[in-house]
């Protein structure tokens, strides 16, 4: 299969005109924000397979997405340092220029009927992405003043190189994402399942989050956590269920069973181990 399409995103009213505070961080409006445009293309193949008692599908696709005037929230001094909170420091949505996201995606879906009493369902997926800024040294905006980050003055001219912890990749993106889910159906009534989720290390964040003073005085532990989890995140979930009858199912679900600490972005802890008892009814 193949596909090609174009996209257009107009800035939201909040990005254009609303200045606010979120969890102690100032968010500034940008009435000069330009729309984001782009195109995407995909080339893939989906193949049915059968091996002994297993049947399923394998899907492989390559993709590329190109963006122009991409919008991204960037840290800087956007407000008057004499009158605004935190000396005018905060985030604002700005156009960072031309970007590209390319990669491959593999997905597998299969079922094996081992015997009359056991059926196994498998679902797996893996995505590799290479999200980059085409011109990391290009000045895309100017802040009001300079910021001292780890002893280096940044600004007022902002580039992707001087505002990022790793400018070789877009901020807050993963390059490797994988998930595997296995479900065992026993005697049609008992269900056991497990899933594993993996993402690699988030290499690029706003450079300000790596500042030693910020890590010591305002948001302790960001650098320590990034170093601790530099190999990425591996999360395990399990579930068990029993079909009470044709219309009712009782399930026990445990997410993040090993209670791993992980973050989707700096200072944003994701849920710890959760245990849920679920009753599903068909009415």
What are these regions (language model features)?
Residues 1, 5, 44-48, 100, ...:
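Transmembrane beta-barrel domains of outer membrane proteins
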């Amino acid at each position: 299969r193949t596909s090609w399409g174009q996209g257009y995103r107009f800035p939201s009213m909040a990005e254009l005109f609303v200045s606010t505070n979120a969890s102690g961080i100032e968010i500034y409006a940008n009435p000069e924000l330009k729309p984001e445009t782009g195109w995407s293309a995909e080339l893939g193949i989906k193949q049915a397979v059968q091996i002994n008692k297993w049947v399923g599908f394998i899907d492989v696709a390559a993709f590329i997405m190109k963006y122009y005037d991409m919008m991204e929230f960037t840290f800087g001094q956007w407000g008057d340092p004499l009158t605004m909170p935190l000396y005018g420091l905060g985030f604002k949505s700005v156009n960072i220029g031309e970007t590209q996201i390319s990669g491959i995606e593999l997905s597998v879906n299969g079922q094996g009927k081992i015997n009359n009493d056991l059926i196994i369902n498998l679902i797996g997926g893996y995505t590799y992405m290479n999200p980059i800024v085409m011109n990391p040294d290009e000045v895309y905006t100017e802040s009001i003043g300079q910021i001292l980050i780890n002893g280096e003055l940044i600004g007022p001219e902002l580039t992707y190189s001087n505002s990022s912890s790793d400018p070789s990749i877009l901020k807050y993106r993963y390059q490797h994402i994988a998930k595997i889910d296995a479900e065992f159906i026993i005697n049609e009534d008992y269900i056991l399942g497990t899933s594993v989720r993996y993402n690699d290390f988030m290499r690029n964040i706003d450079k300000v989050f790596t500042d030693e003073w910020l890590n010591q005085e305002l948001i302790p532990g960001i650098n320590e956590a990034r170093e601790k989890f530099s190999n990425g995140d591996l999360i395990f979930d399990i579930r068990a269920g029993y079909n009470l009858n044709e219309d009712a199912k009782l399930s026990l679900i445990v997410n993040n069973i090993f209670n791993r600490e992980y973050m989707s972005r700096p200072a944003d802890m994701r849920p710890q181990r959760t245990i849920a008892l679920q009753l599903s009814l068909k009415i």
